[in-house]
Curated annotation (Swiss-Prot):
This is Glutamyl-tRNA(Gln) amidotransferase subunit A. One of its GO terms (cellular component) is glutamyl-tRNA(Gln) amidotransferase complex. Keywords: ATP-binding, Ligase, Nucleotide-binding, Protein biosynthesis. It catalyses: L-glutamyl-tRNA(Gln) + L-glutamine + ATP + H2O = L-glutaminyl-tRNA(Gln) + L-glutamate + ADP + phosphate + H(+). It comes from the Archaea. InterPro entries: Amidase (IPR000120), Amidase_CS (IPR020556), Amidase_dom (IPR023631), AS_sf (IPR036928), GatA (IPR004412). The lineage of its organism: Archaea, Methanobacteriati, Methanobacteriota, Stenosarchaea group, Methanomicrobia. Belongs to the amidase family. GatA subfamily. Heterotrimer of A, B and C subunits. The keyword Transmembrane does not apply.
Amino acid sequence: MMAKWMSVAQVKEKIKESSAEEVTSRYLEVIKKSKINGYLTISDKALEQAKKIDKEGHEGPLAGVPIAIKDNISVVGLPNSCGSKILEGYVPPFNAHVIEKLLSAGAVILGKTNMDEFAMGSSTETSHFGPTANPWDLERVPGGSSGGSAAVVAAGEAPFALGSDTGGSVRCPASFCGVVGLKPTYGAVSRYGVVAYANSLEQVGPLANNVEDIAVLMDVIAGYDRRDSTSIDSKTEYQKALVDDVKGLKIGVPKEFFGEGIHPDVEKAVWDAIHKCESLGATWEEVSMPHIKYALASYYIIAMSEASSNLARFDGTRYGFRAGGENWHAMVSKTRAEGFGTEVKRRILLGTYALSAGYHDKYYLKALKVRTLVKQDFDKALSKVDLLMAPTMPNPAFKIGEKIEDPLTLYLSDINTCPINLAGVPSISVPCGFTDGLPIGLQIMGKPFDEETVLRAAYTFEKNTDYHTKRPPEVA
């Protein structure tokens, strides 16, 4: 009998005992019984991939290990809808760089996961294909925009998954679903083949049930890619960072991340986690990051501005959904009006406004200046300490439908995660407690390309607590 939740090491051991085909088949059976709407597409080639790995005796680091992929990452032969009507039916003819790396390592792609439309959201409610449910409470959101990826990992429907993080889209659902999610340093992982939302902010990131599996996946997908000029070969060896020891580490606690509106149980759980690290030999001190209070506004202006440009390419002319029209202009107008959802249209309009003549300097340029100040806050704080620790999300998962009609309230969900994207530094969310049966995430932030220290601290905390071993009763 195969356990529902297994680490990558356990999956590889199971493959040795049986076969990649049997392991893949077991995951596909679990997915068929799913209650959460985590997958948009199941690969009809998954079993074929697994059989080929068995036959050829593939010796890659992920040989036969199944993985789920967010539906904005291109995979040959699988739809890449980005959770949108406008890309419904689009199947890319090429693989994203991270998919090339995964396939070379022997991974088996189970399917594509649900997401907020074009990664614009924090709840996976803006998907054209309906919301994903949180495995811990099916009436609550899993977070977003990589909600499908986090939810299928939490539900035991994949051992790990890939997401993308533009303003918290890996860490938010990791926190809400009680899994581990890493946003790598900007440039650590190639973005080639990932449908762009906001190029200067987003990174591909892994989600898993433990820190070790995050490191395993990063060792496969990270590195330079000539097709992404922002990518860098940092020479990081992620698995070697997994040392159960935080002695001597200096932790900074930014008071601005514990602002008004934080749930008291979240605040307590995070402070308990910090004190746990202190008991294991780390020290902590409070640090101030005065410009963080402007980060959310800066983030949304920059992200929406970049989105208004990036999404101009979707017009029904070349691929995806096309509406009728008397002429080309009418067709494009109608296609975009019908093909994009409400939230995407809102962000395109606001981004276009921020970039328009007369407002560019007032909004967009000012937001870029604030971004520089936020980056300087991180540089200054991290010059004094090795790490920063804070809540990933100020509150636990909220009810489906609770905030979707109030975009400003929904945007506030990103208040603790978007500053990291503005600064481009690495950040991981690890489970650190519960409130009313809902997971709480601890956010650990580090210096650029110092994922080793971030993973070391996360791994040590995980090894000395048991939060990551808890499983959602809704799907157990």
